[in-house]
């Protein structure tokens, strides 16, 4: 009778014994409610001949980041990879991003592979409730693929960006190609360029001046287009070269080297030294230009094309800076378009002078040198943009602040002798802007930056690996320990800093607690080991240990908690 009753009881309870139900039934309150990364993003792949399909099945309430998807071939060559369109996702800290829900399928054409070939796939995602996983890496073995004669193989190097994502990254570069036309117009008013325009216009027209404005316009436009074609070809060549070395150009040492070059180019704009082609090369180019027939469309076009290669001291630095910028972007379309618009901007004043005479030109004076120096500050913005990727956002803000203060101070000094009323108003505006721009520098000097306030308001002690944690635990004899896992890519971690750790009640509750923080942004082997040792699946995760170094049961925090909930959680911890 007892045996039958027991069997009936087990039969009735069997629906509860599925894995999910069993976990829910026996799960402790402090356990992680979020799925393991392999269950949240179920990854699979299949290769049929030269076509490889990568498939992610994404659980409801979870999403993958478009920008965090990277594909690296190893001993293989891949064709063009096209990512599907994602869904726009607004984030308080990272702004507008593109994510994938439910499913992501990526088709990877394999143009060449052997039996030892692989591709390394890296991806990262989050839970919508406020929980992010570290970057995941999967090794996908490839079957041998013999390259076809008609196959257009584009890369045997690591592919970190798809063509679409590379073009999207153009939005994050310091300026769009349309800004190049304004830069070109500005360069036209520097002391090395503007005084030459009347002479160039007379050379374009030749000894027999055309009678109609239409003829004059087409001659001037031919000269400008010749110059623009030369610059466009330079842009395409440099961008194509940059695309081949795109991964190397993202290396911190390369970014630092490019930044130094930009700074040297900018210093030449301030008159410290002059940059130009060797005189022998310039002489040869000038002789070739003089051999062209002026007054004819083809001859004028050829003169413009050669003039594009003859760089004056005022144009060498900006042109070199733009070329380096294009090489770093690796975007061939934007590269050619940027240089074309730059040349067109330089040519617009020349067209006006050729049509209507040099009376349209403003008088020469010191202001032309000021224009040249202003472009020096513009070039200095490029190394700041590049160095941000190496030194981080906090130092990046300080560099932008320093550059802004320098530029505004330069403008104030230039106008300080003027007695004009409007100039006085401009000086007042410049002073106000300088005070605003100095704020990040003031915060840094006094040690009160926003980042420091948010990250160190609780006086966290930073740890980097498992050995450091063990050593601290051994030395700790009487305090409760809180270990916070943080990463720059973790949105909810930043929410903890901004909304929870800054709360006075939370700070009071943790007053007698030893506060540790592990920054796992880089996902290094040591950081991975620390995560694995403590069974941390994702971030944010906060652990509490007693004075003996043992984790307090049911105390682990997974995901974001506001100040009220976190304060209640702290109150339930054993004292």
UniProtKB/Swiss-Prot annotation:
EC number: 1.8.1.8
Cystine bridges: 126-132, 192-314, 490-493
Keyword Transport in record: yes
Catalytic reaction equation(s): [protein]-dithiol + NAD(+) = [protein]-disulfide + NADH + H(+); [protein]-dithiol + NADP(+) = [protein]-disulfide + NADPH + H(+)
UniProt superkingdom: Bacteria
Any GO molecular function: protein-disulfide reductase [NAD(P)H] activity
Membrane-crossing segments per the record: 180-200, 216-236, 253-273, 297-317, 336-356, 367-387, 394-414, 425-445
Signal peptide range in chain numbering: 1-24
Subcellular location: Cell inner membrane
Record GO biological process: cell redox homeostasis; cytochrome complex assembly
Keywords: Cell inner membrane, Cell membrane, Cytochrome c-type biogenesis, Disulfide bond, Electron transport, Membrane, NAD, Oxidoreductase, Redox-active center, Signal, Transmembrane, Transmembrane helix, Transport
Pfam families: DsbD_N (PF11412), DsbD_TM (PF02683), Thioredoxin_2 (PF13098)
Ranges where the Thioredoxin domain occurs: 444-575
Biological function: Required to facilitate the formation of correct disulfide bonds in some periplasmic proteins and for the assembly of the periplasmic c-type cytochromes. Acts by transferring electrons from cytoplasmic thioredoxin to the periplasm. This transfer involves a cascade of disulfide bond formation and reduction steps.
NCBIfam families: PRK00293.1 (NF001419)
Family: Belongs to the thioredoxin family. DsbD subfamily.
Name of this chain's protein: Thiol:disulfide interchange protein DsbD
Source organism per UniProt: Photorhabdus laumondii subsp. laumondii (strain DSM 15139 / CIP 105565 / TT01) (Photorhabdus luminescens subsp. laumondii)
